[in-house]
C-alpha cells in the first residue's frame, strides 16, 4: 500500500501539471473496475486476497503502464515516462514478492476453489477494456460475489500459529530496559521483543486509515508510509532473533492486547491521539536515543543498526502526527494531553485475561534468555534470569495502572 500510495501521489502530481482543475482523479473510470477492487477488498481469505492482488490487479497495472510507455512519445511525455519507469521497478518487486507468497501459502485446493471468483475478476477487467481501458471492451455478465455485501473493516487482529499466546502480558520489557543494573547484552533481547511486538502498530494504524474517509490524498500517503515503517520494525525484531538462532514463536509470546483494545474501544480519532502521545514519549533521551545507545554499547551490531533507523523513522512519524493530528487542537500540549487521556481510558485488564482463561501470563523471559546465553556461549546471570516483572500494574510508558484496569 505504501508503494502504491507513493506512485499514485506522483501520478496525481503529473496530471496536475498537464491539466487545470477539476482533474476528476476521484472519479471511478469504469464501474467494472470498481467491482474488481471491491471484490479483492472483500476477499474472505488470505489466499484469495493474494491471488486477486498479485495474479490479477498488479499484473494488470504493470501491463497498463507498459502499454503507456510503448504508445507515448518519450520526448514530449518524458515527465510521465520517468514517473512510470520508477513505479514499474517497484511494481516488479511487489509482483515477485506476491508470487513467492502465493507459492508458500496457496495450495491447489485453494486455487481450485477460487477459480470461479478469479474468472469474475478477469471478466471485470475484460469489460473495462483492461485497467487502462485501451483494449476492446467485453460484455460479460457481472454478479458480485464477495462484495455482494458491502465491505466493513474488522478491527480484531488475526494472527497465525506463530502467536500462540496473544493475551500474554507476563514480561514487562520497559522496566527491564530502563533498569541500570542490567547490562546492554540482555537488553538487546528485550529490544528485539519490543520491535517484534510493534506488529500491533500496523494492526492499529490500518484501522485508522480504513475508518477515516475523505482526507486529502497526502494523508493516506503519509499514513501508509508510517504503517509500512512500523511493519518493518516488527520484521527487524524477527531478524534479530533469527540472527541469534532463537526460535521466537516458542520462546517469545507476542501479544495483541494493545491493538485489540484500541481498535475495539476507541474511535479512529482517539486511536490517532494515543499514537501521537506515544510517539512524543519516544523522542526524548529516555526513548529512542536511549535504545540506540544500549544497542551501540552491546556486542550485537544488528541491535545498534536497528535502533538507529527505528529512531530515524520516529522523527518522520512525529512530523506526520504534527501535520495530520495536532491541527485539530489549540496546541501540541493539548494534543498530547488528549492522547494520554484516551490511552488511560483503554481497558487491558491483566487479571481478567488470566481469570477468564485467555492466558496464564507465563513468564517466558527465562527461556528466551537461556536460549540466547547458549548462543553467546555464556552461563545465565542469575539476577537477569530471575526477572519477573509483568504488565499487571505498570503500563508500557511506565505509568502505574489503576486498580480499575
Descriptions of predicted regions:
Residues 1-405:
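Non-heme di-metal
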Amino acid at each position: 500500500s505504501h508503494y502504491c500510495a507513493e506512485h499514485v501521489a506522483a501520478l496525481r502530481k503529473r496530471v496536475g501539471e498537464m491539466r487545470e482543475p477539476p482533474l476528476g482523479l476521484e472519479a471511478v473510470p469504469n464501474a467494472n473496475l470498481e467491482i474488481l477492487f471491491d471484490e479483492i477488498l472483500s476477499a474472505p481469505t488470505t489466499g484469495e486476497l493474494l491471488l486477486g492482488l498479485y495474479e490479477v490487479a498488479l499484473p494488470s497495472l504493470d501491463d497498463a503502464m507498459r502499454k503507456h510507455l510503448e504508445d507515448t512519445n518519450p520526448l514530449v511525455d518524458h515527465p510521465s515516462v520517468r514517473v512510470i519507469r520508477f513505479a514499474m521497478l517497484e511494481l516488479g518487486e511487489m509482483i515477485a514478492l506476491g508470487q513467492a507468497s502465493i507459492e508458500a501459502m496457496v495450495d491447489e485446493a485453494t486455487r481450485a476453489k477460487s477459480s470461479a471468483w478469479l474468472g469474475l475478476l478477469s471478466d471485470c477487467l475484460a469489460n473495462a477494456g483492461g485497467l487502462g481501458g485501451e483494449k476492446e471492451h467485453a460484455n460479460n455478465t457481472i454478479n458480485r460475489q464477495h462484495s455482494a455485501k458491502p465491505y466493513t473493516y474488522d478491527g480484531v487482529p488475526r494472527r497465525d500459529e506463530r502467536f500462540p499466546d496473544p493475551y500474554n502480558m507476563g514480561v514487562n520489557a520497559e522496566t527491564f530496559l530502563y533498569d541500570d543494573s542490567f547490562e546492554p547484552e540482555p537488553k538487546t533481547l528485550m529490544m528485539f521483543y519490543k520491535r517484534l511486538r510493534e506488529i500491533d502498530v500496523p494492526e492499529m494504524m490500518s484501522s485508522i486509515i480504513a475508518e477515516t474517509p475523505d482526507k486529502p490524498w497526502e494523508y493516506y500517503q503519509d499514513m501508509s508510509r508510517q504503517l509500512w515503517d512500523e511493519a518493518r520494525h516488527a520484521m527487524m525484531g524477527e531478524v534479530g532473533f533469527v540472527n541469534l538462532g532463537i526460535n521466537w514463536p516458542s520462546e517469545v509470546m507476542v501479544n495483541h492486547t494493545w491493538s485489540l483494545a484500541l481498535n475495539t474501544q476507541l474511535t479512529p480519532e482517539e486511536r490517532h491521539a494515543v499514537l501521537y502521545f506515544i510517539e512524543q514519549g519516544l523522542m526524548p533521551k529516555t526513548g529512542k536515543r536511549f535504545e540506540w545507545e544500549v544497542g551501540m554499547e552491546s556486542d550485537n551490531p544488528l541491535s545498534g543498526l536497528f535502533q538507529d533507523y527505528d529512531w530515524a523513522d520516529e522523527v518522520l512519524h512525529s512530523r506526520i502526527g504534527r501535520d495530520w493530528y495536532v491541527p485539530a487542537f489549540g496546541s501540541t500540549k493539548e494534543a498530547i494531553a488528549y492522547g494520554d487521556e484516551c490511552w488511560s481510558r483503554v481497558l487491558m485488564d491483566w487479571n481478567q485475561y488470566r481469570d477468564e482463561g485467555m492466558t496464564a501470563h507465563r513468564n517466558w523471559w527465562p527461556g528466551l534468555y537461556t536460549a540466547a546465553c547458549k548462543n553467546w556461549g555464556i552461563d545465565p546471570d542469575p539476577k537477569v534470569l530471575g526477572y519477573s516483572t509483568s504488565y499487571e500494574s505498570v503500563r508500557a510508558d511506565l505509568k502505574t495502572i489503576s486498580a480499575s484496569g
